[in-house]
Amino acid sequence: MGGIVDAAVGLYQGAKKVVSATKAFKFLKGAGINPWVALAVFAIGWLYFSTRKPESPDFGDSDFNNFEKGILLNHQSNDMSIPVVYGIRKVGGTRVFVETSGTDNEFLYIGLVLCEGEIESVDKIYVDDKEVTWSGALADDTLRTVDSSDGNFYKDSASLISVKCHYGTDAQAQCDLLGTLSSWTSNHRLRGLAYISLKMKWNQDAFSSLPTITALIKGKKVVAYDGSSVAQTAAHSDNPAWCLLDYLTNERYGKGIPIANIDIPSFYTASGVCDTDVTAYGATTIDVLDCNAVIDTSRK
């Protein structure tokens, strides 16, 4: 990894001699480097120099604040902890797969893990903060392309992005969108993880930098219980009682407490309190408490 960064920094230094950021990128692209790689090189170089600042005093910013700031970012890692999302949240993700293909490397493939699964749905996807209008509703393991009404990512009578969402079941199959590449095999299933796979066609008017992808999702399906302490089918919920119960009992990302050791009637009572309707401003009726949280699993 160090060699890649060193090379990127070196190329960036050479490019910056042409003064502006835009000209620097054009310099890299004109040097015979494929556009996606040029963007990556420029991003790494810029990050390297922009972060080389004098050390400042530590005023005690909490880990929580740092985690909150990173929720909408795109990270690049193969060992980063995966968050749990309860309720409805807009999140970034972790790029676990990036590769180019095509005669001139004009296609960029990305596998972006959002959170632990299984989730209810991916409702919206944004590229560089622009909402993408798709050819149909986003659904699990369903291919979508950009609709012709989208002015940002539909160019020259063609979609620039193809996407497949994967909601993170434990029986999740290989993504055939990424599976067109030999490096994404039938063993790459990302079971139990909610992720989106994308294929992007290079267009200098649509992509001014390495794209940042975010998604509005309905998060983790959780198990609720009825008044007789009978478990219900796992479903999306923003009720804090059932979200807490899921975290306490989950063995993969939570505390792994056996359900037999949990006072289920107390959670049922608490869930009813949370679902109590109250009148907000404008006479709108809302629950007294909802949970729309992103949980940092590295602090388990």
Locate the predicted segments by residue.
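Polar, S/T/G-rich
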Residues: G2-A15, K29-K300
